[in-house]
Amino acid sequence: MTDIENKNYIIALDQGTTSSRAIIFDRDANVVCTAQREFAQHYPQAGWVEHDPMEIFATQSAVMVEALAQAGLHHDQVAAIGITNQRETTVVWDKTTGRPVYNAIVWQCRRSTEICQQLKRDGHEDYIRDTTGLVTDPYFSGTKLKWILDNVEGSRERARNGELLFGTVDSWLIWKFTGGKVHVTDYTNASRTMLFNIHTLEWDAKMLEILDIPREMLPEVKASSEIYGRTKSGIAIGGIAGDQQAALFGQMCVEPGQAKNTYGTGCFLLMNTGDKAVKSQHGMLTTIACGPRGEVAYALEGAVFNGGSTVQWLRDELKIVNDAHDTEYFANKVKDSNGVYLVPAFTGLGAPYWDPYARGALFGLTRGVRVDHIIRAALESIAYQTRDVLDAMQQDSGERLKALRVDGGAVANNFLMQFQADILGTQVERPKMRETTALGAAYLAGLACGFWGSLEELRGKAVIEREFEPSLDEVEKEKLYKGWKKAVSRTRDWAREDAE
């Protein structure tokens, strides 16, 4: 037997916005066990979001140890590790000490809005779009990195001297797990930085010049499925993909026109466009995805900033539900939202609006409105935002989706999934395997080390648990959606005067 035949497990490390997880898969792509730890969110100012990079690594290390112990496994039985991560979140650390120079600036953080406005005033918007596939928005890593270099004393000079390293969360974790030996990222994560040319597949010299970022601090960029290095205990690290691209691969959306939506803290809809980098006319991002063998493919992406976080707000701030699972019960207690629309623009609006100055609002309140209606409106807002993105994506690609594959925590909510199908007028497919993001990372690692032999083998493992068919008539569907568009229009530009 070969060495790989003696190793019957893959570990996927899923480093998310609110927690670090480790999921162990067997050869049939079944989950053997899962370990999870939450970590602190830091909000130093309105619109600012930070994480402690050391806590990210500590929790991610701990859950890997926990998962192995829980499964009764030794690291010698693991063929490889696949890593999937919250994207865009920006870490800068000292190459010698391994200590971060500042907290990780999270993808949700809007502190670099003014930097983005200056880029637009300087006429760089079209170049950024054409080269990186991205819109000029604080969401992406480049302006976050510039903020750190501008605001942490001595950091730019230290970066120029080769003393500091930059990475998205995948780079940070791999650097730590390999004891500082490997400084890499993959094409999917690099494509989210606003520093990477998605056509030449290289760091873009002009973007680095525009943002005054030293080339020396950037990681080497590699394919999403190859062996990058080994942990201190000798486990191969064999797959990397940003969380949404990992989910696309885990759903086996590897052919042009296939699409998925992940319902997490935010919502992310990706459509595979194959070897064609489609330039969006409707506010979508052009991004890099994983091809059939982990090579570069392209995708259109629409990012909704507040999905599951809207339900967290109901629970943690308004305290009108005790648990996210309760929202389905309350939403089903009423026949509709009674004309209420909740626009959860807590941190601005993502695709297709890209308005950092929009703010959240409730519309249509009357004395007849109850808590149930507001809870229902919150769930409906997730589906409406998904339609905003999907409509734009279909116009760009010229393709009509026959079905939308879904994953993420909120897909367990049957009310939301049915309303999603209704407001889209499109079948929604919920897979039996809910861990599609982690599964995508596991697939990439497994293909890299020979644990799985082919894409065909992986396709055979996909099972649809339930299909949700549209049940709303066309007139009612469009009436509801028209109300949503009206509500969104009233939230636009709300905070602009405060910022000026």
Curated annotation (Swiss-Prot):
GO molecular function: ATP binding; glycerol kinase activity
Enzyme Commission number, as recorded: 2.7.1.30
Positions that bind sn-glycerol 3-phosphate: T17, R87, E88, Y139, D243
Binding site for ADP: T17, R21, T265, G308, G409, N413
Keywords from the UniProt entry: ATP-binding, Glycerol metabolism, Kinase, Nucleotide-binding, Transferase
Activity modulation notes: Inhibited by fructose 1,6-bisphosphate (FBP).
Residues that bind glycerol: R87, E88, Y139, D243, Q244
GO process terms (BP): glycerol catabolic process; glycerol metabolic process; glycerol-3-phosphate metabolic process
Binding site for ATP: T17, T18, S19, T265, G308, Q312, G409
One GO term describing the cellular component: cytosol
Reaction(s) the record says it catalyses: glycerol + ATP = sn-glycerol 3-phosphate + ADP + H(+)
Class in the EC hierarchy, top level: transferase
InterPro entries per record: ATPase_NBD (IPR043129), Carb_kinase_FGGY (IPR000577), Carb_kinase_FGGY_CS (IPR018483), FGGY_C (IPR018485), FGGY_N (IPR018484), Glycerol_kin (IPR005999)
Recorded superkingdom: Bacteria
Pfam families: FGGY_C, FGGY_N
Protein family according to the UniProt entry: Belongs to the FGGY kinase family.
Function of the protein: Key enzyme in the regulation of glycerol uptake and metabolism. Catalyzes the phosphorylation of glycerol to yield sn-glycerol 3-phosphate.
Protein name (record): Glycerol kinase
Gene expressing this chain: glpK
